[in-house]
């Protein structure tokens, strides 16, 4: 299921420093027409990071699959695996929570992870919505994540084993 995939993938990846692990995948494979995204990702130097699974908004109406609070950026993550969005405005609702509750003073990225064609379609349907003027919408396909694992900088046999297990 989606939750198992999210838990296993990010539960493992969080043991690698952000700058050598997840950010390598994002810098090489995340897609956005927003020109600021590449600049934001290339400027991140965080090592340790928290991954908050299934974080809920204060009113409980919005739940996102993952949230990563970094020093200068908040990254919301919506994972789709063989299922569409729960509603046409799901990403908008998540973006508003990023903007107003979780990281009002930081840059905000909302990362959609899905099958390549589905991710591209959902991105196109949402990218011009008003909230994405303040929240940077980005997508990443599961196919590219698999390729991106080759970009991870590993410093020990233990880290190599973790990445191999993810493949």
Language-model-derived ranges and their functions:
Residues 1-167:
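Charged, terminal alpha-helix-loop-beta segments
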């Amino acid at each position: 299921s989606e939750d198992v995939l999210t838990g296993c993938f990010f539960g493992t990846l969080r043991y690698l420093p952000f700058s050598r692990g997840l950010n390598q995948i994002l810098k090489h494979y995340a897609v956005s027409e927003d020109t600021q995204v590449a600049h934001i990702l290339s400027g991140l130097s965080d090592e340790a990071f928290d991954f908050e699974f299934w974080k809920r908004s204060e009113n409980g109406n919005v739940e996102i699959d993952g949230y990563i609070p970094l020093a200068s950026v908040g990254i919301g993550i919506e994972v789709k695996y063989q299922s569409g969005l729960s509603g046409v405005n799901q990403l908008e609702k998540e973006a508003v929570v990023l903007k107003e509750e979780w990281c009002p003073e930081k840059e905000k990225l909302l990362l959609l992870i899905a099958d390549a064609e589905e991710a591209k379609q959902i991105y196109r349907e949402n990218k011009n919505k008003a909230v994405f003027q303040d929240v940077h919408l980005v997508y990443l396909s599961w196919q590219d994540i698999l390729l991106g694992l080759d970009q991870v900088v590993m410093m020990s046999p233990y880290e190599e084993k973790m990445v191999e297990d993810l493949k």
